A protein has these predicted regions:
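Bacterial N-terminal signal peptides
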Residues: 36-51
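Aromatic-Pro/Gly-enriched surface loop or interdomain linker
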Residues: 55-119, 126, 229-230, 237-239, ...
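Structural recognition of the beta-strand scaffold that forms the well-ordered cores
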Residues: 69, 118-122, 148-152, 182-184, ...
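N-terminal secretory signal peptides that target proteins for export/translocation
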Residues: 1-35
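An acidic, glycine-rich "communication" segment
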Residues: 64-67, 76, 81-84, 156-261, ...
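Short alpha-beta junction capping motif
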Residues: 119-162, 166
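Alpha-helical scaffolding within the catalytic cores
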Residues: 103-109, 132-138, 206-210
Length: 295
């Protein structure tokens, strides 16, 4: 992966040259000790001036930008809450300054493009159609490469249990990952601590205190929610929230947004405590691709 090269900033260069010129004068009239202290002071001043100079903003779509891509299967054409992914990106950017894609993509489970990015958002309010062999293969490859899939049930039962969408997705995931069973993860898991400290999971509805996850190599590869997180995020064309949040109103919505931010940060960082950037997903994908000379 090539580093992103940036043009030199003339203001930074100017500040640096000024400091160098002052130091090169030898600060006449001062003793050697005072001259040494002066060198240190001017060098520090130069670093401060350089640091204060605004840096060019990162372009959308830079490597590492968070893209809450909508996963589509069967005849599905969009997320259950179509405006939620873009709002997710906006909230993440405004609260953390993390790079985001402002217009999240849509990707089908049987497309090779699924493995172009390390995150996919699968939401719905009705039962999904049985996955095709190609969809199963695509999702299995995505997870095996280290991708994170977030499953958001937009229509759970009143009790907080999975609705038709959630139940059917779990059935299909058992076909994708037959050797893995979802387990409950609560406030002790890093997802609840990546950026905000959260005590429980919440969305448009209160639901269970925990999320469910399919763990692969110690990492939550699939995260399942029966809270309609997208419903808490979605805004209409007027800028007003599209759906009421029950029973906790605005305070619950804020905590739901914080959970969405934490999930995004979990995707961007493979290990929060060590502050490590997410593992190079694209490099792993390319390592498994045949070279052009192979049939």
């Amino acid at each position: 992966m090539r580093p992103i090269l940036r043009p030199r900033d003339p203001m930074r260069r100017s500040a640096s040259l000024k400091v160098q010129s002052y130091i090169s004068l030898g600060l006449p009239g001062l003793g050697s000790r005072a001259r040494k202290l002066g060198h240190i002071f001017l060098a520090g001043l130069g670093l401060a001036l350089a640091a204060a100079t605004p840096r060019p903003a990162r372009a959308f779509g830079d490597v590492g930008a968070f893209d809450p891509r909508v996963l589509l299967t069967g005849s599905q054409t969009d997320a259950a809450r179509p405006d939620a992914p873009a709002r997710w990106a906006v909230e993440l950017e405004s609260r953390t300054s993390a790079p985001v894609r402002h217009r999240p993509l849509r990707v089908r489970a049987d497309e090779g493009a699924l493995t172009d990015e390390p995150f996919a958002y699968w939401s719905g309010d009705k039962a999904v159609e049985p996955l095709t062999a190609n969809e199963i293969s695509g999702l299995r490859r995505f997870v095996s490469l280290g991708g994170v899939l977030f499953v958001d049930d937009a229509a759970p039962e009143a009790s907080g249990a999975a609705g038709p969408f959630g139940r059917s997705v779990r059935t299909e995931l058992a076909r994708v990952l037959p050797d893995s069973t979802p387990i409950a993860i609560g406030s002790e898991h890093v997802i609840f601590r990546t950026f905000y400290l959260l005590r429980r999971a919440e969305g448009r509805i209160l639901g269970a205190r925990t999320l469910d996850a399919i763990m692969r190599g110690g990492k939550a590869a699939v995260v399942l929610s029966e809270h309609d997180l997208g419903g808490a995020l979605a805004k209409g064309v007027t800028g007003a929230w599209q759906f009421p949040v029950t029973p906790g109103g605005d305070a619950q919505r804020e905590r739901a947004i914080r959970l969405a931010v934490n999930i995004a940060m979990y995707v961007l960082c493979s290990n929060y405590k060590d502050d490590q950037v997410h593992a190079p997903f694209l490099m792993r994908r390319r390592a498994l691709e045949p070279s052009p000379s192979e049939p």
